[in-house]
Amino acid sequence: MLSQFKMNPDPAYQNRLLPERDNASFFDGYSVWFYKEQGDLQQANAFTLEFEIAPFGISSEGDAIFSCMDRKTSEGMAVRLTSDGKVEVILGFGGRQMVFYSIRENVDLEKWNHIFVIYRFREGWCDLVVNGVLSNRLQFGRFQKIKWPRHKIFIGKDADKDCLTPQMG
């Protein structure tokens, strides 16, 4: 899926490298992050986001994994790591947002971690699976759709302009 995204065009980081090893791309979310225009995700009633990450460290504010969120209008969705290794999922339905965190399983530093976020529109829940364990489930009204903002979709960067650190958030 990363092949569908473009690397950030910031000329301040023209000398950056994107090393690859074992079919994985290594990037820091500061000089390298990815973006794309919205497309199929905005139309989907149900979808799964899947991430395979091996964080070497997490900032004290937490780090964005996936972001297409506007916190001012409570629109969109974001998946973030908190400073203590929990996975945070934010769903914005327009006018209100719901947040939930991994409970049963969290992310380990310097190890591969597999994260699934499964959004089920018809059933009215969102599952968070971390390393094969159903870590938490958020229930909301059945047939409730995420209201998507006009933001691009980002990997490794927070889309919300008012976040604490503009690179990763």
Q: Model regions: which residues?
A:
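Extracellular glycan-associated modules
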Residues: 1-169
